[in-house]
C-alpha cells in the first residue's frame, strides 16, 4: 500500500498531489459560463452550492487547526446524523455571492489549506488531533482525505449533472478506498434488536485492492483485513466502491446470500 495509504505519512505526497489535481479540475469546471446554477449529482445541490460547501468547510478547517495548535476548547461535535441537512444549508448560504468572486475565494482557501497540509510533519500527520465540526477529534491526515473526498467526488458530481457519460478518477478512488470503511463505520445505523452478522468486502483492483471482513452488531460496524471465503461477499472495483459508499450509485456484485448483502447495503444513512 505504501504511498497509496493516506493514513500513513508515506502516503502524504501522493494524497496531496491528487488533491491538487482534483481541486484544479473542480474550479475549472465550476468557473465555466452557464454552469453556475446547473444541477449536479448531489441531490438538490447546484454547482454554486458545491463551491459554497467547499468554502464553508475549508474555512472551518482553518479555525479547527488553530484550536488544535493552540489547545483551545471548541464546542462538542455536532454529530454526523444532521450533517447532510446542515452542509446543504451552509452550501446554499453563499448563493448571493457572484460566481467569479466565490470561485476565487474557493481557490484562495484551497491554496491556504494545501499549504497547511504540506507543512504537517510525520508526527502531525497521525498525532495532531484536530476537532472536526461533525465528527470530533481526528488525526490531521483525515483533513487531507476530506479535501480529496470533496474535490474528487464533487468534481464527479458536476460531471454527473452535465448528463454526459463519465467516470471517477482511478487515483481518487484508490486513495479513498481505506477511508470508505471509516465512512461506513460512522454512518451505520443497525437496529438495536437486529442479529449480528458478517460480510466480506472485496476490492478487485487498484493500489488498495484486497479483502476485508466486516462485522455488524447492535453497537455498529467494525472491520479488518482477512480471509472472506466463508462469507457472503460484496465485490467492487475501487470507483464503484467509493461512489456506492457516498450514495451516488448502486454498485457492486453479490457473491453469496443476497439477503445478507441487501441487509448490509441498507444499514447506512447519508451525509
Each language-model region and where it sits:
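Non-cleavable N-terminal signal-anchor transmembrane helices
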Residues: 1-42
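Short, helix-capping/interhelical loops that line the mouth of catalytic, cofactor-
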Residues: 2-13, 60-119
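Amphipathic alpha-helix face/heptad-repeat signature
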Residues: 15-22, 53, 102-109, 143-147, ...
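Short, contiguous alpha-helical
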Residues: 34-81, 130-189
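Contiguous mid-protein beta-loop-alpha structural module that forms a pocket-lining wall or clamp
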Residues: 93-156, 160-161
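A glycine-rich beta-turn/hairpin centered on an aromatic-Pro dipeptide
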Residues: 174-214
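Acidic/His-leaning functional-site neighborhoods
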Residues: 203-233, 237
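C-terminal interaction segments
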Residues: 226-271
Amino acid at each position: 500500500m505504501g504511498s497509496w495509504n493516506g493514513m500513513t505519512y508515506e502516503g502524504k505526497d501522493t494524497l496531496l498531489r491528487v488533491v491538487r489535481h482534483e481541486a484544479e479540475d473542480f474550479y475549472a469546471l465550476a468557473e465555466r459560463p452557464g454552469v453556475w446554477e446547473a444541477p449536479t449529482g448531489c441531490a438538490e445541490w447546484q454547482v454554486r452550492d458545491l463551491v459554497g460547501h467547499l468554502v464553508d468547510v475549508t474555512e472551518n478547517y482553518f479555525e479547527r487547526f488553530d484550536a488544535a495548535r493552540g489547545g483551545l476548547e471548541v464546542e462538542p461535535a455536532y454529530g454526523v446524523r444532521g450533517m447532510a441537512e446542515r452542509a446543504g444549508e451552509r452550501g446554499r448560504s453563499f448563493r448571493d455571492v457572484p460566481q467569479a468572486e466565490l470561485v476565487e475565494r474557493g481557490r484562495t482557501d484551497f491554496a491556504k489549506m494545501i499549504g497547511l497540509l504540506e507543512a504537517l510533519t510525520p508526527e502531525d500527520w497521525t498525532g495532531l488531533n484536530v476537532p472536526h465540526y461533525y465528527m470530533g477529534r481526528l488525526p490531521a491526515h483525515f483533513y487531507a482525505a476530506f479535501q480529496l473526498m470533496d474535490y474528487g467526488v464533487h468534481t464527479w458530481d458536476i460531471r454527473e449533472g452535465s448528463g454526459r457519460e463519465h467516470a471517477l478518477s482511478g487515483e481518487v478512488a484508490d486513495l479513498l478506498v481505506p477511508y470508505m470503511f471509516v465512512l461506513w463505520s460512522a454512518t451505520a445505523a443497525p437496529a438495536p434488536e437486529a442479529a449480528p452478522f458478517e460480510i466480506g468486502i472485496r476490492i478487485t483492483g487498484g493500489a488498495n485492492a484486497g479483502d476485508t471482513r466486516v462485522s455488524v452488531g447492535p453497537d455498529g460496524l467494525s472491520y479488518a483485513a482477512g480471509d472472506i471465503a466463508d462469507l457472503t461477499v460484496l465485490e467492487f472495483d475501487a470507483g464503484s466502491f467509493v461512489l456506492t459508499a457516498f450514495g451516488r450509485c448502486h454498485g457492486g456484485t453479490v457473491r453469496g446470500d443476497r439477503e445478507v448483502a441487501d441487509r448490509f447495503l441498507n444499514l447506512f444513512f447519508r451525509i
